[in-house]
Amino acid sequence: MRMTVLASGSKGNSTVIATDNTRLLIDAGLSCRELLKRMATAGEDPAALAAILITHEHQDHIAGIGVLARRLRIPVYFTEPTHRAWVRMLTPRSTITYAQWLDHVQQEKAARAEAAAAASAEPEPPCQPDVESSATNSGAPEPGAPFMTASSSWVGTSATDPIALSAAADPDEEDTPAAPKADPTHLPTVEYFHAGVHFSIGDISITPFTIPHDAADPCGFVFESAADHARMAIATDLGYMPPNVKAALRRIDVLLLESNHDLDMLKDGPYPWSVKQRVLSRVGHLSNAAAAEFLLRDYDGGAHTIVLGHLSEQNNDPSLALLAAEQALAGRMSLLGNRILLAQQSAPLPSICL
C-alpha cells in the first residue's frame, strides 16, 4: 500500500492511495491538466484510477473533479450533502433549475432566429404603373423603411441592419438546433457514503469519519489494505481534534495530518480579521501548536510516517511546522522512531510505501 501526496495547501489538495490492484484519488483540488501532470511526475497512471473520493466541497479540494471524472469516466464518491453543495456551487445563480434555465436560453435563441428570418424578407413591389401614386394610396413602405409584420411587431429591414445581415449570411440558422450547453455538474457516476459506515473499493476498505470544518458534511478517511491490513489516514481541514477523530487515528501506519498555520504568523499576517477568526475557529484549520498537542498527548505512536499537510503559504513556515511536531515527539521517547515529512503545494511528495 502507498500514499502519494500530489498537492497539499490552500491552493489545492489531492492524494493518491493505492495498492497493487486498486488506485484511488482523494480530492481533486487542482485543474484536470495539473492533476494529470502531477500523477505522471509521481509515476501514477491516471487510467488506473478506480474512483475519486471527496472530503468536502471547498474549491481547493474539488476544482478538477468534473473534468477529470468525465475524462477518465470514473465514479466520484461524496456524502450526499457534499454533493448537493457542489452542485449548488456550479448551478447558475437563479431561482430556476439548471434545466429550466437552459430551456429558457434555447427559446430566446429560437426567437432571435425567427425575428432575423422575418427581417430578411423584403416587401413585394406594387404592380402599378404609377409607383408614386400607388405608394401614396396603398401605404406601402418606402424601400428600407420599417414595416409591420402580421403579428404587428415592428421589425427593421435596413440593408445595414445587423440582424438582417446575419440572417442573410446564414439563411438556414433557424433550422439549426441550438447546441446543448454542457452541464458542469454532470458526472459519469455518483456514489454516496456516510461518515462512520465502512465501504470498499477494490481491495481497499474505507472508513469515513466526521471532521469539524465549515463545509456541508466534511470528513476524513481511514484506508485499510485487504492484503496486509496496512492502514493510512487523511485528517486535514479541521478546526480542532474532537474525540471521534482521535479515535479514528489509532493504529495508523501513515498519517497525513494538518498543520496549517503558526498562530503568531496568522495573527500578524495580511488576512482580514474575519478570515483570521474563521481559520482560528473550531471549524477552521489546525495550527502547528494544535497538531503538536495531539502528537504529544493523544497520538498512539503507531505511524511509520507522519506527513504534515495543508501548510499555509501566507501564515506558516515549513520549518516552524516541522519543529513543533519534532518537539512533540521528542517529549515521548517511544515516538522517536516516527518519520516526519512535509507535504508541498507546488510538487508531489515521493510515494510512501508499506
Predicted regions, residues:
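Metallo-beta-lactamase
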Residues: 81-219, 223-229
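Metal-dependent catalytic neighborhoods of phosphoester/phosphodiester hydrolases
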Residues: 63-72, 93, 316-323
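Active-site metal-binding motif and surrounding structural segment of the metallo-beta-lactamase
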Residues: 32-85, 253
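Short, basic/aromatic-enriched C-terminal tail that caps enzymatic domains
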Residues: 338-354
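Short, hinge-like loop/turn segments at secondary-structure boundaries
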Residues: 43-44, 93-99, 225, 252, ...
